[in-house]
Amino acid sequence: MLILISFTALILFFLAGMNMLRKGLISMAYSKIEERLLLFTDHPLKAFLISIVFTGILQSSSAFMVIVIGFVSAGVLSFKRTIPMILGTNVGSTFTTEFIAIKMDIVIWVLLIGGLLFFLTGRYPLKQLGTSFLGLGIIFFCISGFSHLAGPLTKLKTGADVLYHVNDSNWSALLIGMVLTAIIHSSSVCIGILMSFMNEGIIGLTQAMSVVLGSNIGTCITAVMAAVSGGYAAKQTAYAHVVFNVLGVALVLPFLTAATGFVEQLSPDPAQKIAHFSLLFNVVTALLFLPLTNLFYRLIHLLIPAK
């Protein structure tokens, strides 16, 4: 029981750290992030690139999609203009996973203590920088905690059952990644936990790649929930996010086992292998779909016609 409580607490702290990092970055970078975002949506390539940047700042594709759906619901952004932004936000979300894959155990306390001192100054931009440092320190502390709990978790019946299904087949691993991400509303937390288990040699690379693919689908749940009370354009935007991610996974999943050898060569570090795979998957699928935005727009209109 204590292990499960500790694991749950680490997830909550990880989410809190992500929120602190996001707030600090937004405060330092842009005072009116939403208004500035609208200036760059007049061309698909510009919308694609700016969504990568803003998702990197927000540290969350879910948060970015909630903002986008809010604009669509308000009628200041058309559904068609959101399609390249959906492609870009998936790429931008991989910045977080690349960052947390770096081994930074030795600087955790430097980030926490330094962040606290900066925060206590109460001065701009030191306070905002301190908030980001504190958030980052908490994230790396949680990653370290997940690694320490990975072994004990496998000895629990629930943990053993989940790991059995993850390692049983790619489909099971994909489903678990999708459900876990949908429950905690953060693909970064899901992949952070996955990296910790990989570092302990508990999960194989191919199965871990499947979890990443599932996480890409599960992360869409926040956008779908945000669009429930919106109009048809908002619903089209949310479901376009789902359809794009499902199609991307469907394209890659049949070749996953064959791609494992290539991913194996990307880095000697297990966590970085997963981070690099997530980046490559999202970049490749985004570049494949970007020239097809008009076709994709018509497809969504067929699936969810406006009334």
UniProtKB/Swiss-Prot annotation:
One of its GO terms (biological process) is sodium-dependent phosphate transport. Its main location: membrane. The keyword Magnesium does not apply. It is a multi-pass membrane protein. InterPro entries: Na/Pi_transpt, NaPi_cotrn-rel/YqeW-like. Keywords: Cell membrane, Membrane, Transmembrane, Transmembrane helix. It is found in: Cell membrane. GO terms for cellular component: plasma membrane. One of its GO terms (molecular function) is sodium:phosphate symporter activity. Pfam families: Na_Pi_cotrans. It comes from the Bacteria. The chain crosses the membrane at residues 1-21, 52-72, 99-119, 133-153, 174-194, 208-228, 242-262, 277-297. PANTHER family: SODIUM-DEPENDENT PHOSPHATE TRANSPORT PROTEIN 2B (PTHR10010:SF46), SOLUTE CARRIER FAMILY 34 SODIUM PHOSPHATE , MEMBER 2-RELATED (PTHR10010). NCBIfam families: Na_Pi_symport (NF037997), NaPi_cotrn_rel (TIGR00704). This is Uncharacterized protein YqeW. It comes from Bacillus subtilis (strain 168).
